[in-house]
Amino acid sequence: MKLYIGTKKGLFIHAGRGIGKPHFLGDPVSMVLPDSDGTLYAALNLGHFGVKLRRSADGGKSWEEVAAPEYPAQPAGSQDKTPWKLVQLWALESDGKRLWAGTIPGGLFTSENRGKSWQLVESLWNRPERAEWGGGGYDHPGIHSIAIDPKNPKRLTVAVSTGGAWQTQDGGSSWSICAQGMYAEYMPPEQRFDQNAQDIHRLVLCPARPEVMWAQHHNGVFRSTDGAKSWQDVTAIRPSKFGFAVAVHPKDPDLAWFVPAVKDECRVPVDAKLVVARTRDGGKSFQVLRKGLPQEHAYDLVYRHCLDVDRTGKRLAFGSTTGGLWLSENQGDSWRCLSTQLPPIHCVRFG
């Protein structure tokens, strides 16, 4: 088992014997992808020097720079208020043949040559609804979740903060919005159920049952059992319905995990106690898991890409804004702290 941890100060790898020396020390790593073919990708956000993408064919022993997604020039006279410039590579996924990249300011890109070149998915970028997308945690909108149906890789669902969820059935040639049933408490009453105004924090699907999806939304937890055609509000979650991260078991669509927090005002664990919420029955009930987690003076926030489950469905790991990293080998019943001294963590992935 390898665990990849992207942080504000580099990429760390835990290979079972502890955490190794950092790669790209000092550079913010916004996303990492351990691809099924053994290739490792790391996205760096170097601020003034731009977004960079690194690729390794030997598990991180050596790295080479490959192309980062690039936006075309904004057309003359365009009224688009969103800049046509890459701000961050926020999501990175593979369907086995193609790479998919979600970015801020809201463009989706694809590569068919392992990152040597990228193409903007214009069919989504040119949707008129995009003009209404807005920034959530950032100044501009962004695609942070790319859920690929393993049984039909041409079916993708992406989530936008803030711009709802969008789905393609034909590999990106056409798109339809798919956030029916979600609600936005921050909008005026007449726009509460506007699908294009939904601030989804994270969206995942169950690989064995891809029609079942889970979403952690700014205003709650939602679940779909019909491939995102409709969403149901999951009200049983505790100790709060706010959070960023969600993970679903690879084979059991009813088993999912969340890391709740206090919404908006201060964004810390409820009562300063770090817990994980788990459901085994599709959201009808939840267990609050705390064994091995700090239960006083815990101010750890777990970002949307910082909770992951491995392919067996037994191991989970999550990292926090305060540099804490925890591992469970029994589906969350108990947790072991791997570190409390890492830089703020941006993403955690098994590989």
Locate each region found by the language model:
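Extracellular glycan-interacting surfaces
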Residues: M1-G351
